[in-house]
């Protein structure tokens, strides 16, 4: 098995490390945090493909935040972050159980009730 996967996106190339996340599953680990060039280029490409009339963007914490922020800035709108745990500041949080391919145990995702009202 090759140790990396060559990703071509928005005119850029990145070599992603392959990681075994289960006995029968290997994924190419894609972490864009800190890759300003990749975030800005993909944000511009995605922005151009989005329809008019979007009110909010929603993203999971934390890896998607920079890309979502860059797209929202271009759209001139705000965005909402779905958290991985209930935070003390949340009002009437909306909690959903999920199963990720990168973790063995079930997790929860949490949307602040105030953000849920916006959406």
Predicted features along the sequence, with ranges:
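Active-site-facing substrate-recognition patch
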Residues: 1-54, 115
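Preference for short coil/turn "hinge" residues that link or interrupt alpha-helices
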Residues: 9, 20, 60, 102-107
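Short, glycine/charge-rich flexible loops or terminal/linker lids adjacent to PRPP-binding catalytic cores
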Residues: 77-119
């Amino acid at each position: 098995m090759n140790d990396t996967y060559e990703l071509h996106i928005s005119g850029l190339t990145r070599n992603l490390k392959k990681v075994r996340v289960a006995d029968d599953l290997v994924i190419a680990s894609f972490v864009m945090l800190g890759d300003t060039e990749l975030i800005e280029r993909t944000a511009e490409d995605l922005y151009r493909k989005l329809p008019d009339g979007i009110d909010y963007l929603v993203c999971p914490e934390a890896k998607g935040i920079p890309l979502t922020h860059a797209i929202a800035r271009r759209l001139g709108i705000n965005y909402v972050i779905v958290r991985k745990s209930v935070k003390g500041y949340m009002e009437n949080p909306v909690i959903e159980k999920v199963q990720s391919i990168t973790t063995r145990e079930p997790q929860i995702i949490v949307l602040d009730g105030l953000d849920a009202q916006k959406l």
